């Protein structure tokens, strides 16, 4: 299963391990007369079982619940000796509303909990009032449901490691038991769940949009546009009318009525451009193959896309900081964020489909002006050696030098002295380094945030690539459009570095390391659906194929006995 339950258990074991100071151990045998005794007997009958089944439901936290109840001397958490507490109804309503979070109440014992409550409150005619075993079962299910649901709200329902999501952002740790205790003590489960829910504005926006798109689906969604011919200004006919209606349904067309509904007029062209812009397409106002494909994505698929990206928000810590850099891989963009708002943005180039840029975070501490490029060994072996074999002037033309040895023992080698025919894609015992200058692959600057992936931001001499709509050309690092502007921003607190002094340094072909006075977090993330600060819903293609396995994992049923 893909549920992140081991993580939950680890957190809760640490939380509960200390017990309650000053209370003597329970040594009396259970009488099975009260819910408390039944709960105790459930766990003590055969030690701590690998699986605890309650009312036909698998208790997911069977390793943790015994400790939770031991700490409270096995007293029920959700009922008194005869009936459920009022807090239960609030929690049930919250589970019924789990779909607002892109989650399912059924994954948290909702049906069984409601059945038990029904038996307790409305016993069938001729039946005795349900005994304490019903209250015990209800208590165990409610506690398990709360711990699992709050964990999913805080950390996500799916563990990204299990689906190879290439997501390495450091997640948060939370005291779930303390959260439960607070809810019980304050009789306010709603507040406790709010504290567990992602507090990022980006998450809240997607939650609102999820409700809107579900409403579209309930009203029948939007129809599929037939035919493959492109549609452009001054065209007319039934396909144009269908296009207009399609854009009305998704909110891209301002007016629901038009006197010339089957004519591709200026108003319709503007609506097409608006649609293209929020789907990452070239905004030419023409419905070509790419635009038609995006238009024909059904609303149900967009709903799944929204749910997938809400899950990614849950994978993040509750705060990213007041100031940080944010790269959205799927949008090919870098943003400078202050108080969750963009203060600068620029186009970016990310890794090729077979050299994908991972999602992770790290702290940027320095930048380098006029950097050398130490060519990674796999690039040297697989890409450059074949080029050198074809053109013996390749190294000179590209200002690349050859070195042997490592670190202090490294020394330059004359490439003419080497037998290049002996080198293959699997064997090249030398190192290549490209000198600083206009041909350097890193451009004029690189921005460093040490990480295990050896990924960093850098300039590029090939500026024309930023004009492409889809920008997947790198070996995994991120090329940025406005390196000088970013350097100015990062060095603003260092009076020695202004735009002028940076430009002066660029004119000297010597690499120079500059410490960033106020280090900044860098988040490299993967969003295929989000809502802009102005409320515009954005969708992007799943360029690395990461949405599908996550969507499938979210659809999986919870464990069964």
Language model features: what each stretch is:
Residues 6-19:
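Bacterial N-terminal signal peptides
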Residues 7-9, 129, 234, 330:
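Generic hydrophobic-segment detector
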Residues 15, 25-26:
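Cleavable N-terminal signal peptides
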Residues 26-70, 140, 144-147, 167-174, ...:
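Well-ordered beta-sheet/strand-loop patches within structured domains
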Residues 29-172:
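Cationic-aromatic interfacial patches
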């Amino acid at each position: 299963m893909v549920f992140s339950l081991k993580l939950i258990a680890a957190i809760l074991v640490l939380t509960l391990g200390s017990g309650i100071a000053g209370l003597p151990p329970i040594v009396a045998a259970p009488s099975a007369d009260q819910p408390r005794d039944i709960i105790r007997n459930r766990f003590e009958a055969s030690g701590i079982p690998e699986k605890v089944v309650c009312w036909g439901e698998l208790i997911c936290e069977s390793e943790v619940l015994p400790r939770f109840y031991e700490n409270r001397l096995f007293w029920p958490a959700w009922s008194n000796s005869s009936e459920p507490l009022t807090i239960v109804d609030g929690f049930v309503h919250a589970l019924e509303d789990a779909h607002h979070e892109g989650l399912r109440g059924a994954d948290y014992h909702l049906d069984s909990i409601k059945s038990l409550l029904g038996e307790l409150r409305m016993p069938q005619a001729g039946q005795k009032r349900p005994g304490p075993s019903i209250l015990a079962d209800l208590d165990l299910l409610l506690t398990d449901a709360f711990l699992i649901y709050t964990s999913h709200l805080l950390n996500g329902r799916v563990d990204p490691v299990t689906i190879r999501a290439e997501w390495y952002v450091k997640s948060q740790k939370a005291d779930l038991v303390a959260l439960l205790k607070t809810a019980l003590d304050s009789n306010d489960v709603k507040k406790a769940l709010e504290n567990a829910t992602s507090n990022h504005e980006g998450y809240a926006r997607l939650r609102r949009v999820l409700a809107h798109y579900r409403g579209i689906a309930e009203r029948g969604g939007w129809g599929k546009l037939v035919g493959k011919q492109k549609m452009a200004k001054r065209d007319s006919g039934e396909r144009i009318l269908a296009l207009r209606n399609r854009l009305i349904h998704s909110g891209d067309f301002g007016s629901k009525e038009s006197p010339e509904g089957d004519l591709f007029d200026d108003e319709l062209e503007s609506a097409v451009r608006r649609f293209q812009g929020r789907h990452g397409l070239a905004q030419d106002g023409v419905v070509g193959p790419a635009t038609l494909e995006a238009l024909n994505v059904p609303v149900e698929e967009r709903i799944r896309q929204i749910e997938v990206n809400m899950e990614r928000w849950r994978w993040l810590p509750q705060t990213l900081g007041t100031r940080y850099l944010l790269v959205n891989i799927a949008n090919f963009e870098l943003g400078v964020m202050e108080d969750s708002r963009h203060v600068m943005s620029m186009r970016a180039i990310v890794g090729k489909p077979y050299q994908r840029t991972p999602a992770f975070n790290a702290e940027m501490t320095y930048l380098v002006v006029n950097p050398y490029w130490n060519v990674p060994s796999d690039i040297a072996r697989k890409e450059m050696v074949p080029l050198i074999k074809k053109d013996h002037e390749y190294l000179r033309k590209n200002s690349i030098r050859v070195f042997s040895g490592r670190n202090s023992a490294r020394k330059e080698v004359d490439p003419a002295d080497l037998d290049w025919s002996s080198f293959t894609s699997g064997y090249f015992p030398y190192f290549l380094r490209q000198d600083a200058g206009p041909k350097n692959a890193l451009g004029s600057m690189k921005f460093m945030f040490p990480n295990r992936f050896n990924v960093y931001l850098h300039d590029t001499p090939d500026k024309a690539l930023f004009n492409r709509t889809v920008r997947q050309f790198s070996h995994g690092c991120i090329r940025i459009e406005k390196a000088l502007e970013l350097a100015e921003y990062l060095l603003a607190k260092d009076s020695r570095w202004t735009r002028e002094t940076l430009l002066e340094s660029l004119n000297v072909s010597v690499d120079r390391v500059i410490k960033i006075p106020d280090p900044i977090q860098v988040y490299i993330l993967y969003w295929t659906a989000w809502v802009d600060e102005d409320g515009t819903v954005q969708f992007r293609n799943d360029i690395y194929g990461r949405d599908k396995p996550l969507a499938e994992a979210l659809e999986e049923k919870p464990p069964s006995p």
